[in-house]
Amino acid sequence: ALMMEGGVQINAQGQRFHDETQGYSEAAVHVLAQPGGVAWNVFDDALLAFAQDFPDFVAAQGAGAVQHAADAVALAQLIGCPPDALQATLNAVQPGTDPATGRTFKRALQAPFHAIKVTGALFHTQGGLDIDAQTRVLRQDGTPLPNVLAAGGAARGVSGQAVWGYLSGNGLLSAIAGGHIAAHTAQQLLKDSAP
C-alpha cells in the first residue's frame, strides 16, 4: 500500500528502477534483478502514519524492520548508496508523471525518511494439472483421464504464464469456481454410471 500511495523502491546505486505501482509479483522480478537482489522501500512521515492502519506493517515495525533517517544523506548511509545519486532520485519524485517509468506521483516525499529492506520471494506456485472445461484431468495428448478431476491449486489456474497475470484472489477464484464445476462433473459421472 505504501508504494501505491507514493513510496519508492531504491537500489544499491540510489536509484529507482521500475514503476512501483505495478504490483508485488512484478516488483519481485525487478527487485531480484538489482545488485544483491535487494531494494529499499522508502517513504516519509505521512506514509508512515498511513501504514499504522495495517496490522502486518505494525508487526514488522515492532520487529525492527522499519529504519529511520533524518535526511537524504542519512538515508544514503543506511542504504549504502551514493548520497548524490539518492538525492537526485528523491528530487525527481515530484507531482506528475515520471518520464522514465510512467508512474504518476501526487506529491514529493519529505524528510525525515523511513525505509524497509526488501527482496523478492516465491509466495506460492500457480497452476497444476492441465484440465478441460469440466475440470477433467487431461493426458499429454489432450484426452481426459476417466474419473479424474482437479480444481483449485491442483489444476492449472487463470493467472497465465507470467507475473503480470496474477491478481490477488486468483487462487480462491480457481478453488471456488473449479470446485463448483468439478462437483457438477462428478454428479454427472455418477448419473452416467448408474444402472
Role assignments for model-derived ranges:
Residues A85-A162, Y166:
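A glycine-rich dinucleotide-binding beta-alpha-beta segment and adjacent secondary-structure elements
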Residues Q15, Q22, Q77-D84, A88-P95, ...:
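Generic secondary-structure signature for well-ordered alpha-helical cores
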Residues A39-F43, A72-A76, Q87, N91, ...:
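Predominant activation on well-ordered alpha-helical scaffold segments within soluble catalytic domains
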Residues A27-V31, L149-A150, A194:
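A short, polar/proline- and glycine-enriched secondary-structure boundary/capping micro-motif
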Residues I116, G157-S193:
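A conserved FAD-binding loop/helix module that cradles the flavin
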Residues R16-F17, V137, I181:
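Hydrophobic "anchor" residues
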Residues A1-A85:
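An anion/pyrophosphate-binding glycine-rich loop and adjacent beta-alpha core
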Residues A12-Q13, A133, Q140, A177:
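Short, ordered coil/turn segments that flank beta-strands lining enzyme active or ligand-binding pockets
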